């Protein structure tokens, strides 16, 4: 039995999540869809809008199983969030991880993930961190490809891909183009409703 995993917060569950879950199952041609979902706290420790059981109930309209992401993942940066989520997916023997991204270019995101793993080992990277430069700024300077690093779902997708390369190299990835309003967009785009 083949499974696709979705690393989620569903804070709250909406039509975009339903679209992502449905398309992920269709494109991955899997039998089971598993959501690895944050509990009562979402990324970086923000309290969830709805209790985890209510969000699970909503999610089960689109997925077959919801497993709670360990709390340490929810309280962490995107790289640690991704690492904990991928390790959880590996424990569940998930075959494919599907995530949304603004670019929808798995090839470009995988290439950048590989570059970033190499750059993080470089002495210049560690020196720039000591100088107080931010992680995204250093990476955009080193990669010279800051367009992919300007979009929050691309950044999170790259974190998933890095974690997969390091901890679950047998796992496959699938990315779905994020449609509609962007993560930090302050104006609602009515053309996608």
Q: Which functions belong to the PLM regions below?
A:
Residues 57-71:
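A glycine-rich helix N-cap at a beta->alpha junction
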Residues 27-31, 63, 94:
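Short, high-confidence coil segments that cap the C-terminus of an alpha-helix
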Residues 1-55:
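N-terminal catalytic cores of NTP/NDP-binding nucleotidyl/phosphoryl-transfer enzymes
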Residues 14, 59, 161:
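Divalent metal-coordination and catalytic microenvironments
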Residues 69-193:
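Active-site cores that bind ATP or allylic diphosphates and position pyrophosphate for catalysis
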Residues 25-26, 60, 86-90:
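Non-catalytic positions within long, well-ordered alpha-helices that form the structural scaffold/packing
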